[in-house]
Amino acid sequence: MYKKLGVLLGFSLVTFAASAQNLHMNDLKLKADIDWLNTQGVTQISTSTWPLTANEIRRSISVATAQTQAQQQVLQSVKIRLSNNRESVVQAFGELSLQTSRQQLPQAFADNKLAGQQAMVGIALTERDWEANIQATVKNDKLIDDSSDVSFEGSYLAGNYANQWLIGGKIPTWWGPGHDGSLIRGDASIPVTGFTMQRDIQNAPTSQYLSWLGPWQYQLFAGQFDDYEAVPDAKLFGARLTASPWPWLELGASRTFMWGGEGRPESLSSFGDALLGTKDNESTNSSDSVDDPANQLGGFDAKLNLSSLINVPSNVYGQYIGEDEAGGLPAKNMYLAGVDYASSIQGKPYQLYAEYTDTRSSGDVEGISYDHFIYTDGYYQQGYPLGYALGGDAESIAIGSRVWLDNRNFINAKLQHAKVNQADEAINQAFPEEDKLTSIDVSWEHQWQPLTKVTSRVWAVDSDNRSSDIGVGASIELKTY
């Protein structure tokens, strides 16, 4: 393993880190930049559905006007990201990260350093309407055991036609308005391999009957699980739709279902039952499970931008997801709610947020959330949740802040208290036993040179059942331009 790390590290020292530029995968700094500008009323770009497209970001910032020094600083940061876009380019890239053990540290958005030692190299090819990103990662002291020595997460091939992107590969996803988590499609697990389809530019409909919807986006997903032992070759399907009928409101609806796999029906009629939600949960806890076509989740989310409504730079948002019951609305719901505020002090932009999450079943610990009586490994891949990072039957309150010290230094900090795995479900390998945690997590991103970024991180976790954990991590990334 260390020999493989050394080989990849050798390549990474003579290549450069970059990423294809038409599509932006989960990126905390980019999300924070856009969220801050949205809250300030400078831009209107949805960050509730990832990946984001460069053309959609460009559409909004092309008409954005900065009124203050802080707004100009953050807007310029996004413009620099987009100015790197070229219509035809080949890029090589590499990254090295090191960290101490982090078994108890809750994951957050774009938190993809999941090994003690991790080295990644690859190549990206970008044209105006297509792009390919091939990358290989070797990990030692892995947090998630994926039974492979070399992983290709983050690799994809994508094409754009008639304002529609089709992406095939192993890419992260994010559905929802939360800062720290999504109840239905988060990025705590290794990405599910599959196909994603979504719009490029999120213009409002031109029809006089539909123009009231405002800017809108959809995302469709179809893929297959890796290492899902309970039902090998199980499939995952999902759909999300968002719309902003007014500048101060974004609404979203999401649905996923696990279907098929070894020993399960894979007929067209069975898929139709799963797609329409018929027969779902009719045979729950019954020995006759043939009629239950899928493990389904669904729900809604909303985000209210107070800057556009009452000139206060703040957002209020919420999400609820439940078991997608046949013939009705979701039941046995999980909830997420939060508020954030964006301003500046002495010309330095900052953002504050508070977020509460409850993944119990409508407030009760029942061992139902992210679980299923057929797909008994649950709504997890390799034991890590596809939804909220803490898994089912958890409660969490998080308070966080982001500070832009200048155009080269960005700090992200979070204090979180959580009750995890209160049903004591073994399928949750992220937190395999009932516990109470209090954690503080601080990271610093430094643009050392125009082509070099260094990130450092320190955290501390206090646990009821385990000894306290204090950890540190660092990574270095190089770019071609």
Spell out what each predicted region is:
Residues 12-17:
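N-terminal signal peptide c-region/cleavage motif recognized by signal peptidases
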Residues 18-111:
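N-terminal periplasmic/intermembrane-space "pro-region" immediately following the signal or transit peptide
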Residues 23, 46-50, 68-70, 80-92, ...:
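Short loop/turn motifs that connect adjacent beta-strands in outer-membrane beta-barrel proteins
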Residues 47, 106-112, 142-146, 183-186, ...:
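Outer-membrane beta-barrel domain signature
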Residues 98-104, 127-129, 138-142, 161-163, ...:
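Transmembrane beta-strands of outer-membrane beta-barrel pores
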Residues 112-119, 147-155, 188-198, 233-237, ...:
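Residues that define the transmembrane beta-barrel architecture of outer-membrane proteins
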Residues 194, 241, 446, 467-481:
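Outer-membrane beta-barrel "beta-signal"
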Residues 194-375, 399, 411, 419-426, ...:
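Signature for the C-terminal beta-barrel architecture of outer-membrane proteins
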